[in-house]
């Protein structure tokens, strides 16, 4: 008995009908795209889905049909350049089109494209394609900005406890930061002739203007004292053993003093204001003994000027520098680490509250901690050279301690 083909058997239908009437499977894959050895495959395609024109591996939904990249390009070029009227067939338009024969007859290939449903009206000419791409890019940029604004709106602001901590840290900074917000009006400029004539030779070949060095050492003791006072006003710091307090202060003192100088960078005059009172130029600070450290602090000042930090942000950054659990010799490492995490979290939430316009503001600001660490390391190396050559009486005792 002859077996009739089942109507449910897709092989019993004509090839073109199967491609036209068959429903496309759309899988909810775990990732947005499927990758294979042959390249990019959109998530809505089956792994081995074939081009409805030639049977080659399909790459996507092109001009209303699932096709390969080759047939997509052939169809687009044919329409854009109006080539189809010039096509002809040697075999009365009866060629079978597959991935082997598709390049042998342009007319039959084009007829196959039309018969399976590829839409001529969807092909854009060059000017329209450029306009479409521009529109896509504009929409993408708009969505990116909207998502960024949305993410900023959903970032947490400080809690009530964090606001209390932020207030304490800010007041500690303001009460120990010389001249406060009036530093520009109260600063005094180091005379031009000081720091311009290097005199004493150093072991590494550099020279130091001892007059400039002497001026700097006059303000170093009160600057260190203010950093110590700042630390003592922080409740978490005062709860630590005295041994740990000393180690933390020695570790952060140069970092905090450098930060306080850097945020008082004046781009118009090209000066830094040290200890809130002495405005110096780059060359003066260099010749006064700091050399490469001078460049690092000035460069930090220039970069920080774009951040427009307020007193609270400077204060919290100082607290983060102070509570560094990686200082050598600490006893209560875990406690100090938790203290720093508390400051960091309050700091991050305050940054969210401030809503800065600089992209990636928070991670960029944290990178300044690394810069300040490098300044401290350079200063320590420089100080060893200076101790050898400069008279010991020029160094204040407290400066020698830290």
Swiss-Prot record:
InterPro entries given in the database record: NHR-like_dom_sf, Nucl_hrmn_rcpt_lig-bd, Nuclear_hormone_rcpt_NR1, Nuclear_hrmn_rcpt, ThyrH_rcpt, Znf_hrmn_rcpt, Znf_NHR/GATA
Keywords: DNA-binding, Metal-binding, Nucleus, Phosphoprotein, Receptor, Transcription, Transcription regulation, Zinc, Zinc-finger
Molecular function GO labels: nuclear receptor activity; RNA polymerase II cis-regulatory region sequence-specific DNA binding; thyroid hormone binding; zinc ion binding
Residues annotated as binding Zn(2+) 2: 89, 95, 105, 108
Signal peptide: none
GO terms (BP aspect): cell differentiation; negative regulation of transcription by RNA polymerase II; positive regulation of transcription by RNA polymerase II; retinoic acid receptor signaling pathway; thyroid hormone receptor signaling pathway
GO CC annotations on file: RNA polymerase II transcription regulator complex
Domain NR LBD: 161-402
Gene3D superfamilies: Erythroid Transcription Factor GATA-1, subunit A, Retinoid X Receptor
Modified residues (Phosphoserine): 12, 28
Region (Modulating): 1-50
Principal subcellular localization: nucleus
Keyword Phosphoprotein: yes
Residues bound to Zn(2+) 1: 51, 54, 68, 71
CDD domains: NR_DBD_TR, NR_LBD_TR
Function: Nuclear hormone receptor that can act as a repressor or activator of transcription. High affinity receptor for thyroid hormones, including triiodothyronine and thyroxine.
Domain comment, as recorded: Composed of three domains: a modulating N-terminal domain, a DNA-binding domain and a C-terminal ligand-binding domain.
Protein name: Thyroid hormone receptor alpha
Organism the protein comes from: Pygoscelis adeliae (Adelie penguin)
Upper lineage: Eukaryota, Metazoa, Chordata, Craniata, Vertebrata
